[in-house]
């Protein structure tokens, strides 16, 4: 069986804010639907051949269904990513050295979920 990962769903009580945040991080907008009860938008996680992230609204009275934590490898460019995030106007803690000697950057999105860059 040959399966390919196509994307993931993000659910948020503030989907437009999440959408704008990830656009500021540099995610390419694949599709943006006019606001409705569901709010549908798709952002490319990397390039046009890679997976997408769909952003959906959590219906009134419902809880966040799951965790939305992302993990990215930077090919040794953690500090460059950090500078790009800062220049986009996003508050971001500085990268740090791990006990194994690598460098990591942990960012939190407006819903409080973790984005880890290594």
Where are these regions (language model features)?
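Glycine-rich, highly charged phosphate/nucleotide-binding loops
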Residues: 55-57
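Vicinal oxygen chelate
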Residues: 1, 4-13, 32-33, 41-42, 60-118
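Core segments of cupin and vicinal oxygen chelate
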Residues: 2, 9-51
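General N-terminal targeting signals
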Residues: 20-22, 27-28, 44-46, 70-72, ...
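Short, flexible, glycine/charge-rich loop motifs used to bind or transfer phosphoryl groups or to couple energy/partner
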Residues: 59-61, 94-95
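Short, charged/polar, Gly/Pro-enriched secondary-structure boundary elements
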Residues: 48-53, 111-115
């Amino acid at each position: 069986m040959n399966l390919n990962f196509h994307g993931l769903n993000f659910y948020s009580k503030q989907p437009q804010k999440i959408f704008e945040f990830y656009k500021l991080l540099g995610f390419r907008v694949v599709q943006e639907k006019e606001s409705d009860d569901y709010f549908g938008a798709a952002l490319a996680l990397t390039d046009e051949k890679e997976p997408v992230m769909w952003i959906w609204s959590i219906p009134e009275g419902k809880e966040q269904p799951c965790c939305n934590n992302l993990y990215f490898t930077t090919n040794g460019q953690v500090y460059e990513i950090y500078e790009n995030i800062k220049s986009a106007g996003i508050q971001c803690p500085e990268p740090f050295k791990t006990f194994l000697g690598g460098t990591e950057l942990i960012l939190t999105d407006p819903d409080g979920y973790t984005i880890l860059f290594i």
